[in-house]
């Protein structure tokens, strides 16, 4: 705990894939200052994605200064700082100079595909799944780190001599903000590295050996809510969580069975499973989230590949809407989709199907189908895919979802939110505060330093702007969903495997 009596603000740093943001909250969790800066995306080869870690730190530092200036407050009035970040993105730097030895390898980057294939050939897939809760995929940090050590001249030797440090973006920012004094991460970020045992809560020696990672490179792993150190200007750094886990906490989904969906380009669904690390039978990830005091809780995570991107396709490729916001109007003009289903398997299907060979399709077309029906079917597809993942989660953990909390750009679409409630048969709650990812980091930091007294105080601040209650009867709901499942089956295994 620190003395926060005269300090009435918390800063959340939200370090994302395309931009760095700083958001300042007051004691009522109102936003009083914001700043955002984009940074460059580097694509050195097809399927490769990199960021410059120095540019990430520079943009993040600048947004802090700008947000403070906008709010008209000084560092001395800030009780603590919380960090939420793009997960899995990997940085390796020289601990003496603070200079990266290579660009950050971003979560989207697929360069370590062959490393993952070799891990599977060597029979490590089941051990990785059991230990980390993750699938053997280039998405996660461990194989990215191995690639850097294997491909940057002298990196492996220097790492073994203890000269290099590894971190995800949270670790990198804290190391820079503290002037190289603190090398730390939290459990949520560690759980995304493919090197962390989510049951023992330790770096896993066998996985480090398999990947050839020197243990001395790795940060200390701590809870998501505690004081880790101080910035050079004296602000306590007191909260860390990966972006999706931070949104889960910002939505106050801290009890088992509570879930949130972030509707972005894709959709990220997380369900809190409490102290049970539930192993999925449906290809969902088992990951670490934040409990009521920022301690370790477990969650199931599933991703829908094409959510908001389906609406972008209507706008940019088909050109049947001028603005994503117009889709609500057109979808509401017709009483139903007239039997049309759009399956947006543009890049295959994610959870729970995991079919990279599926391709998108429109079904149920007749001469009576209008553009409005197709627009409606596109929005409905986002809700159907969300149900696919939530049904899998409920089957895995044996818990019934009481309500779904929502955030992200598409939640402004009232038609989509109502149809989501209808097809789930569950209330959908849209919060007044849309900045739930940054809010989660602020809450974690504020709890650690005594800025907020506890969960009850935070729950009082979680104002639901609108609740969407299901309006379809059970027969209608299941008939519509059966049509969706039939449509999905017709898209499966479409692409030739050799293609």
Curated annotation (Swiss-Prot):
Belongs to the FGGY kinase family. Keywords: ATP-binding, Glycerol metabolism, Kinase, Nucleotide-binding, Transferase. InterPro entries: ATPase_NBD (IPR043129), Carb_kinase_FGGY (IPR000577), Carb_kinase_FGGY_CS (IPR018483), FGGY_C (IPR018485), FGGY_N (IPR018484), Glycerol_kin (IPR005999). This is Glycerol kinase. It is an enzyme of class 2 (transferase). It catalyses: glycerol + ATP = sn-glycerol 3-phosphate + ADP + H(+). It comes from Pseudomonas putida (strain ATCC 47054 / DSM 6125 / CFBP 8728 / NCIMB 11950 / KT2440). ATP binds at residues 17-19, 265, 308, 312, 409. Its EC number is 2.7.1.30. One of its GO terms (molecular function) is ATP binding. Sn-glycerol 3-phosphate binds at residues 17, 87-88, 139, 243. GO terms for biological process: glycerol catabolic process; glycerol metabolic process; glycerol-3-phosphate metabolic process.
